[in-house]
Amino acid sequence: MAYAYTFGGLKMADKTNANIGFEKQLWDAACVLWGHIPAAEYRKVIIGLIFLRYISAAFEKRYNELVADGDGFEDDMDAYTMENVFFVPEEARWSTIASAAHTPEIGTVIDNAMRAIEADNKVLKNVLPKNYASPDLDKRVLGEVVDIFTNNIDMSDTEASEDLLGRTYEY
């Protein structure tokens, strides 16, 4: 599938097929945001959501490994950090965010998720965006972007997904 549109200085048609799937999802998210917020703000919205989606997937993978081990360490933060995985509290997990996608509180849910992650991961203190509850960001539109990242971006292979943040920023 080739697109003639230009986004991020690159023509979608010039991309390899391996990248088009992910970049099409970014394009779809940008199209949803188009007309609702300034184009310069897309990155802030999208990168924060991709970050949440990625760390939640990495956490879930590690959580399942710890449960399978059966030693009861699935709630021990050190069991995650020793594997270079951020601890993600319940209120910040993607499943919580996705379940709130079609509520008027979605922006607050995402901002609270960012705060919770910062509280449990001091290295991220004051780093994550917390602008999703802004009255300038239409919550219906934000919910649509969350849906795109829930339904169309596969994070099951977190090692392969590590590059998504860099690719998102470059795109």
Predicted features and spans:
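Non-catalytic, mostly N-terminal accessory regions of nucleic-acid modification and defense proteins
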Residues: A2-Y171
